[in-house]
């Protein structure tokens, strides 16, 4: 991770350390983890894991997992290179899911606005179908782009 991002992670970690500790021992799924906001979250959670004995298991679904190839190996980070908007079955018991996968191209938004919305909504539908009976899942956060509005 570059120096600017690392410094941001240190600052955020120090400010929210106690809140982040509530995630210790939990499994978190992040879709769209290579995007601007969620990649910061992935880096922050990895930094948390460096500083704490009780780790957070981080699973990232994205079509651009190469973004994290410079991080090296971490047994608490699983990168899943796939398209969440396609029919897939998710089986891992997650405590939290943050769904932020979306098409990230203003040019594409303008040319194909419905496809932009479909990719985001279909991904959410796949998540909801996979976890509608989950007893471990505490929360799903759904993020979208302002471009779709």
Segments (PLM) and residue ranges:
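Non-catalytic terminal and boundary segments that flank Rossmann-like NAD(P)-dependent oxidoreductase
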Residues: 1-29
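N-terminal Rossmann NAD(P)H-binding glycine-rich loop of SDR-like oxidoreductase domains
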Residues: 27-47
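Conserved glycine-rich Rossmann-like NAD(P)H-binding loop of the short-chain dehydrogenase/reductase
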Residues: 50-67
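Rossmann-fold cofactor-recognition segment
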Residues: 73-86
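NAD(P)H-binding glycine-rich loop region in Rossmannoid oxidoreductase-like domains
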Residues: 84-119
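Conserved Rossmann-fold NAD(P)-dependent oxidoreductase catalytic core, especially the SDR/UDP-sugar
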Residues: 99, 125-149
């Amino acid at each position: 991770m570059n120096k600017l991002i690392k410094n941001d992670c240190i600052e955020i970690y120090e400010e929210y350390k106690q809140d982040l500790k509530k995630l210790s021992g939990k499994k978190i799924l992040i879709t769209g983890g290579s995007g601007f906001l969620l990649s910061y979250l992935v880096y922050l959670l990895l930094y948390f894991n460096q500083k704490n004995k009780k780790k957070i298991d981080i699973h990232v679904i994205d079509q651009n997992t190469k973004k994290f190839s410079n991080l090296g190996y971490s047994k608490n980070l699983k990168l899943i290179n796939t398209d969440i908007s396609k029919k897939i079955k998710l089986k891992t018991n997650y405590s939290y899911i943050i769904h932020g996968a979306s098409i990230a191209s203003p040019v594409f938004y303008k040319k194909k606005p419905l496809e932009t919305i479909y990719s985001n909504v279909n991904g959410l539908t796949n998540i909801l179908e996979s976890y509608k009976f989950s007893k471990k899942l505490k929360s799903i956060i759904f993020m979208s782009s302002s471009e779709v509005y």
